[in-house]
């Protein structure tokens, strides 16, 4: 117990210390929201990765999908690395950075408003982000509480409040730069922690070969492959179709999430994007691949906890796997998941507060608000969002994965297509953007009431629908003015200026002497 407490105290002290150290970088709106657009590739890549993977992934998704799909759930981690990180950086990174700087936009709704020359689109995007980021923030705590309850036997409410207060302190002090530096530290902890945990769990089950053999002898209880042995160690698992839905939601979804795309706004230059792409992809392979690989052995643990609906409590799977580890490893796990959760929470509340302040309050209500007042309002809203997320977390309405599925589906379904097409194609119309918003949010919300499929599949469908609807509607609706389009895209015509030192000929140098 002493080891675990010491690790936590040191961790908390470092987080607060970083907030104090970086407070000088948060003296204006640009510094507070984007770190002055001067954040290096390492900090940006780690900020992207740690915002991507939280306790939702480690406890919620890894436990649930590892139990359902066995080792084939590792495909989710591979998809996260290839589609959610590598392709996201290659396709969106440079163009998002260049166009957002050209349009002087600090948030995704502001980008939409300026790219499509529509204040109504900006306000609608801000409202969608405001409404659907909340379920994600509340879900971050839930996974953490399971591990804290296992390690320290302390009440859930204490876990939630302590984490919220600590996150709020360093975000309010240092803004984006505090989150970026802390994300880097937390990312290092996550990399070390996930490797140590996998080794510890496999050793506790007789090593990889023995664990694999035991898993291969289990009969599938999934309808598609019911009764078959070896389904949980097969290439695509017992239920490939639903597995594909999870891969699409968790991988392609990052392309449309405001808190993820914002990382491209803040990176300092185009050269840094190349370095960041490599780092971010490696980070995702280790963290996501490791989490889902670990979850693939979930059936080796006897989980008896049942929900009120009579189904297995998937949120208890990973904590049960870890409960027999030595104290030092449990301490590492707690700090690992705390790191993942705090980094995601800090990114979410900073994104939410900046969108509400810059796009709704300053953009529509108090247009003459000065920078000092904007900073004050953002800090107040950070407190508001954290308190709201705590209230929701203390009475969670559904499973971690379902909460995440609702928010990811609505946000990515609404924003992915208007963003991706808007960066490359001059033909996107305002009507096409509105159609994307309606399709993304409409499918997700309709499924909440109709329950015709799982929130995971509904989220994946909403993203694909947006990618289809936006171009179709754009083909048959009035185009933007040529001047409006040319203004947005002329940023790509600019060539980076490279300073070249020219050496004087030797005879001129001699003559000068």
For each predicted feature, which ranges?
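Membrane-embedded helix-loop-helix hairpins and adjacent transmembrane boundary segments
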Residues: 1-513
């Amino acid at each position: 117990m002493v080891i675990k407490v010491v690790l936590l105290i040191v961790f908390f002290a470092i987080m607060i210390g970083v907030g104090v150290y970086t407070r000088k970088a948060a003296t204006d709106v640009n510094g507070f929201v984007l770190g002055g657009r001067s954040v290096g590739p390492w900090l940006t890549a780690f900020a992207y990765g740690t915002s991507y993977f939280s306790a939702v992934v480690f406890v919620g998704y890894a436990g649930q999908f590892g139990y359902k799909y066995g080792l084939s759930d590792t495909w989710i981690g591979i998809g996260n690395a290839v589609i959610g990180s590598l392709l996201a950086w290659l396709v969106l990174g440079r163009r998002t950075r260049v166009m957002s700087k050209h349009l002087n936009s600090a948030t995704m709704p502001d980008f939409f408003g300026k790219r499509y020359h529509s204040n109504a689109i900006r306000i609608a995007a801000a409202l969608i982000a405001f409404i659907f980021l909340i379920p994600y923030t509340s879900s971050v705590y839930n996974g953490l509480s399971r591990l804290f309850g296992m390690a320290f036997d302390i009440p859930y409410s204490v876990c939630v409040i302590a984490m919220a207060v600590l996150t709020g302190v360093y975000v309010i002090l240092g803004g984006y730069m505090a989150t970026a530096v802390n994300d880097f530290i937390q990312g290092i902890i996550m990399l070390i922690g996930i490797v140590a945990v996998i080794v510890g769990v496999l050793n506790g089950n007789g090593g990889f070969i023995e664990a694999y053999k035991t898993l291969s002898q289990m009969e599938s209880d999934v309808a598609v492959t019911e009764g078959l042995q070896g389904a949980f160690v097969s290439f695509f698992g017992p239920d490939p179709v639903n597995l594909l839905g999870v891969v699409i939601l968790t991988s392609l979804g990052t392309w449309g999430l405001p808190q993820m795309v914002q990382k491209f706004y803040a990176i300092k230059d185009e050269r840094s994007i190349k370095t960041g792409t490599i780092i971010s992809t490696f980070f995702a392979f280790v963290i996501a691949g490791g989490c889902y690989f670990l979850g693939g052995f979930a059936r080796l643990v006897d989980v008896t906890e049942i929900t009120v609906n009579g189904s297995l409590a998937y949120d208890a799977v990973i904590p049960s796997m870890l409960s027999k580890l030595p104290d030092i490893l449990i301490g590492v796990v707690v700090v690992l998941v705390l790191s993942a959760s705090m980094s995601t929470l800090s990114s979410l509340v900073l994104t939410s507060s900046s969108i509400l302040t810059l796009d709704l309050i300053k953009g529509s209500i108090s247009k003459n608000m000065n920078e000092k007042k904007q900073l004050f309002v953002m800090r107040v809203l950070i407190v508001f969002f954290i308190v709201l997320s705590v209230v929701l977390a203390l009475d969670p309405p559904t499973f971690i994965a379902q909460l995440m599925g609702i928010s990811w589906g609505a946000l990515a379904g609404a924003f992915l297509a208007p963003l991706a097409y808007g960066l490359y194609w001059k033909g996107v119309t305002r009507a096409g953007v509105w159609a994307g918003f309606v399709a993304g949010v409409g499918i997700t919300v309709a499924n909440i009431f109709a329950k015709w499929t799982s929130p995971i599949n509904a989220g994946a469908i909403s993203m694909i629908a947006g990618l289809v609807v936006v171009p179709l509607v754009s083909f048959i609706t009035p185009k933007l003015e040529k001047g409006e389009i040319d203004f947005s895209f002329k940023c790509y015509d600019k060539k980076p200026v490279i300073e070249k030192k020219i050496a004087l000929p030797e005879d001129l140098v001699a003559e000068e002497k």
